[in-house]
């Protein structure tokens, strides 16, 4: 469903290929790194749609304005955050030690591949790959950071009630 949304937004904003690249790279890193999860399915659908829309708009803006240095800088900051926090499990799907190590390793590999794609596409000014990969790291960075804040808050709240 969300791939279709990304494609539709890509067609509307005239960045079809970029929207597909964004969605694929985001799904790869998200699947293994984890991050924020909404409480309800409806909230998840709304937030996911808005997140995809914001990223496609960001990609479109990168085609209109030279924001490559800003995208590169923000992406690298979020890459460090993802590297530190991944994988982020949830109370609904906690990870045991073996799973944690596996997901961390895979997350780092995927993150490294996306960073290489960003750097190479930045050097060669290949914006079709650069902007979508940056958008995927920015979104995942926001989600993993938000997820970590939510997790710490819930743990503190639970321990204060005990």
Label the model's feature ranges.
Residues 39-50, 69-74, 98-104:
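Cytoplasmic-side transmembrane-helix entry/capping segments in multi-pass membrane proteins
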Residues 9-23, 70-77:
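Structural signature of hydrophobic alpha-helical transmembrane segments
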Residues 130-145:
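Small-residue-rich transmembrane alpha-helices that serve as helix-helix interface/gating elements
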Residues 66-80, 135-136:
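Alpha-helical transmembrane segments
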Residues 89-112:
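Membrane-helix boundary/juxtamembrane motif in polytopic membrane proteins
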Residues 55-67, 110-126:
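Hydrophobic alpha-helical transmembrane segments in multi-pass integral membrane proteins
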